[in-house]
Design a protein with these regions (language model features):
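Catalytic cores of RNA-modifying enzymes
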Residues: 1-190, 226-232
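Conserved Class I S-adenosyl-L-methionine
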Residues: 166, 196, 204-234
Length: 234
């Protein structure tokens, strides 16, 4: 079994919080739900009772095998092992207690995927990054808020996990606004490596010209995305 600490993963052990996550996901019998991180499967019975189909993926093959044994009664459940970000499944709703080490990757992946909405649980510090303003923003903040509507649902205390993490978590509801392609996401990350420079000097790095003296921190999220689009057009 993959050591969970290597993945930064802590398993939810609270049924009431599991119910809150599933209720906030607003699942109908027409929905296909994609769960990243099967774990012990605390969400699976709740998801399967509401959805048309549930696809649950875990990086740990042993956990997937255990889930197949424990949840064989659900005909609408598909269990897979491997890297969930490489799966080609289509879905309408995304649900995940995101491993801390994979949270940024998950947001960038979701920004590229077409889906309706979802509920994710992330480390409190990471949640604050996603909704940060101005100088506290990171590239992932821009990517997240441009591609997604994000609403904070609840703080989840660390004693609701096994093993307990060092910090609390936050449940977020996300709704898809628009897709961002992989090249654009990569370029937004590159732009933030020059965040202390002016737009004029950033564009010089890409052999382009500008007279704009503003720094990245002075631009809106939309302006940063448009800057990346401008660079890609050349």
């Amino acid at each position: 079994m993959i050591k969970r600490k290597l993945l930064g993963q802590h398993f939810l052990n609270s049924k009431s919080i599991a119910e809150l996550i599933v209720n906030e996901a607003e699942i109908s019998k027409d929905d296909v739900v994609f769960e990243l991180g099967t774990g012990p499967g605390i969400l699976i019975p709740l998801l399967c009772k509401k959805a048309k189909k549930v696809i649950s993926v875990d990086a740990d093959e042993q956990l997937t095998k255990k889930a197949r044994s424990n949840f064989s009664q659900f005909d609408n459940l598909t269990l897979k092992s491997g890297d969930g970000f490489k799966k080609k499944d289509t879905f309408s709703i995304f649900v995940s207690n995101l491993p801390y080490s994979k949270s940024k990757d998950a947001i960038e992946w979701l920004a590229q995927k077409s889906f309706s909405h979802g509920v994710i649980m992330v480390q409190k510090e990471f949640a604050e990054k996603l909704i940060a303003k101005s100088k506290d923003r990171r590239a992932v903040s821009i990517i997240a808020t441009y591609a997604l509507d994000i609403k904070k649902i609840s703080i989840v205390r660390k004693n609701n996990f096994s093993p307990p993490p060092k910090v609390d978590s936050v449940i977020l509801k996300i709704s898809k606004k628009t897709d961002l392609d992989k090249k654009l996401i990569s370029l937004i990350n590159d732009i933030f490596s020059y965040r202390r420079k002016t737009v004029k000097n950033i564009l010089k790095q890409f052999n382009q010209q500008s007279t704009i003296e503003k720094r990245i921190d002075d631009l809106t999220g939309e302006e940063i995305v448009n800057l990346a689009k401008q660079i890609l057009k050349k």
